[in-house]
Amino acid sequence: LVGSEMCIRDRRIITHEHFYLQEEFSLMGIHLNTRNSKEPHDYSGHISCTCHSLDEVQNKKHFYDYLFLSPIYNCITKSGVTSGFTAEELRQAGKSKVIDSRVMALGGITPDNILEIKDYGFGGAVVMGDLWNKFNACTDRDYLEVIRHFKKLKKMAD
């Protein structure tokens, strides 16, 4: 889908833009972000959103099916976007259940740090830049490298 980001979790698809696709293709739900911060008027399905602080997670947790917390590590694709949390803050948030199975780690996730995500108590990891860097949509035609890398990450996270 051109101009749309998709998140796949447990073989279910959430659209981050073009919310009409949710109904048209019976997708799992929609994801709210700064560009699309409100759900459609009569929408009643699965909703997730991105948060940028632990307080925001705590305040929004009861209103959404799950949340992304970002940036956990320095962003791979956006220069100057650095980690918003210390390891101790994340450990403590996991112990106090602010971070739990409904909170997904986003930002700078790579094979070097994906195992830490489990230790902090996150329900999963959102991998973007690390995968994007494995494939150039303008020049590459062979998806095998990005598929291999995804499988490697998935195996590490399982």
Regions found by a protein language model. Give the residues of each.
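Histidine/lysine/aspartate-rich catalytic loop segments that bind and position anionic ligands
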Residues: 47, 53-78
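Expand to "…catalyze enediolate/carbanion chemistry for C-C bond making/breaking, isomerization
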Residues: 158
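Charged helix-capping and loop-helix junction motifs
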Residues: 81-91
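Helix C-cap/helix->beta junction micro-motif
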Residues: 8-9, 43, 99
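Catalytic cores of alpha/beta
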Residues: 13-28, 52-63, 96-99, 104, ...
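S-adenosyl-L-methionine/SAH cofactor-binding core of RNA-modifying enzymes
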Residues: 31-58
